């Protein structure tokens, strides 16, 4: 990991009526220097283009353009996120 970079946790899921549905979910542990850098890496892996919907300070929600998909990006916390299975590392 390069200087200035940290881990981010990204949850990618489907939407129904504009809200996250979680009928399927892909989870990522991403090394990046910002929330935007983390979603760029996920976009490159999934071929979705994302637009920021809102930012709460510790979590950012992105919506995929032209698809019923959203992504939640937050800083990786070992206590909260280590128990998830099948997390893709980018």
Task: For each feature predicted by the language model, list its residue ranges.
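A short, exposed loop/beta-hairpin motif centered on an aromatic-Gly-Thr core
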Residues: 21-37
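Intrinsically disordered, low-complexity Ser/Thr/Pro-rich tracts
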Residues: 28-31, 41-43, 62, 73
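Short, mixed-charge low-complexity intrinsically disordered segments
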Residues: 48-90
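A short, charged, amphipathic alpha-helix used as a generic interaction element across diverse proteins
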Residues: 33-57
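Short aromatic-glycine-(Arg/Gly/Cys) micro-motifs in beta-strand/loop hairpins
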Residues: 2-25
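N-terminal cationic leader/targeting segments used for protein routing and processing
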Residues: 4-7, 27-30, 62-64, 78
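Intrinsically disordered, low-complexity segments enriched in small/polar residues
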Residues: 2, 15-16, 30, 35, ...
């Amino acid at each position: 990991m390069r200087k200035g970079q940290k881990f981010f946790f990204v949850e990618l899921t489907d939407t129904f009526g504009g809200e996250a549905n979680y009928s399927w979910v892909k989870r990522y542990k991403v090394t990046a220097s910002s929330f935007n850098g983390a979603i760029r890496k996920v976009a490159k892996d999934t071929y979705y283009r994302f637009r920021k919907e809102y930012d709460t300070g510790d979590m950012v929600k992105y919506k995929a353009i032209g698809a019923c998909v959203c992504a939640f990006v937050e800083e990786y916390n070992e206590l909260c996120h280590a128990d998830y299975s099948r997390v893709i590392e980018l």
